[in-house]
């Protein structure tokens, strides 16, 4: 299935699941959508936190199509699930933004670690959340983001359990892709990130961590949602964690070496 065909399946309502493992060679994107009045500070926030918030594209006010991400792409309808935040609280999840869309909305598309999972799989590195048919586990850490204006919050990380040799190989592979979070930010000691229990992720689903495996943590594009919650904007929108926008950007094109 091509990315365009996948987006059509989302738009029609046929696909409403987490997007890990879909359209493997193509990049997926996190979304943050907010009024133009706050867009400059949010852009500075992303630039100040490039590990968690690597920008793939930024829209013009009111634009719901970003040609840099793909043809026949509609931000309002092509994500399986959206989070709606009002005054910093998650008030609803919706499957379309058509009724909520405003002419002053600015779209930020942020790289997603689902993008490099295809490369890991090609190297024989098994990914537990895909094996178990679950959403990837994500955790809010105790590490503060670099603040920009009203935006702060805490770093969010995704976790994949790997054996030692696979963890080393994963570092080597993902280091080539800083546009989709790059190398892990931590390996092995969740308490050092302020994570007390791997079995209770803040977002996504828990997965099995087997004896002899290390938890490997990558910066996560859900990080901006902690900033949106802390800023308490009257209205802001993001993807539901794990339910991403499929782009036409090839993962190979994002490699820096």
UniProtKB/Swiss-Prot annotation:
Its EC number is 4.2.1.-. GO terms for molecular function: lyase activity. The lineage of its organism: Bacteria, Pseudomonadati, Pseudomonadota, Betaproteobacteria, Burkholderiales. Belongs to the D-glutamate cyclase family. Coiled coil: none annotated. NCBIfam families: PRK05463.1 (NF003969). Signal peptide: none annotated. This is Putative hydro-lyase Bamb_5282. SUPFAM superfamilies: PSTPO5379-like. Pfam families: D-Glu_cyclase. Keywords: Lyase.
């Amino acid at each position: 299935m091509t990315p365009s065909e996948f987006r059509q399946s989302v738009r029609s309502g046929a696909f409403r699941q987490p997007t890990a493992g879909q359209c493997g060679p193509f990049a997926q994107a996190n979304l943050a959508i907010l009024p133009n009045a706050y867009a400059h500070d949010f852009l500075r926030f992303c630039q100040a936190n490039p590990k968690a918030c690597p920008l793939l594209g930024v829209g013009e006010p009111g634009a719901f199509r970003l040609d840099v991400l793909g043809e026949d792409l509609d931000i309002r309808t092509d994500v399986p699930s959206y989070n709606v935040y009002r005054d910093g609280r998650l008030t609803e999840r919706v499957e379309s933004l058509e009724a909520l869309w405003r002419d002053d909305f600015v779209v930020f598309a942020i790289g997603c670690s689902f993008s490099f999972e295809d490369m890991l799989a090609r190297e024989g590195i098994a990914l537990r959340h895909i094996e178990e048919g679950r959403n990837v586990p994500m955790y809010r850490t105790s590490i503060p983001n670099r603040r920009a204006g009203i935006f702060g919050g805490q770093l969010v990380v995704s976790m994949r359990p790997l054996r030692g040799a696979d963890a080393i190989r994963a570092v080597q592979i993902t280091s080539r892709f800083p546009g989709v979070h790059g190398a892990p930010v931590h390996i092995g000691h969740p308490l050092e990130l302020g994570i007390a229990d791997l079995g209770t992720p803040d977002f996504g689903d828990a997965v099995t961590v087997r004896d002899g495996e290390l938890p490997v943590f990558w910066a996560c594009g859900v990080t901006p949602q902690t900033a949106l919650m802390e800023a308490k904007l009257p209205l802001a929108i993001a993807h539901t964690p794990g339910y991403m926008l499929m782009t036409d950007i090839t993962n190979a094109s994002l490699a820096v070496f």
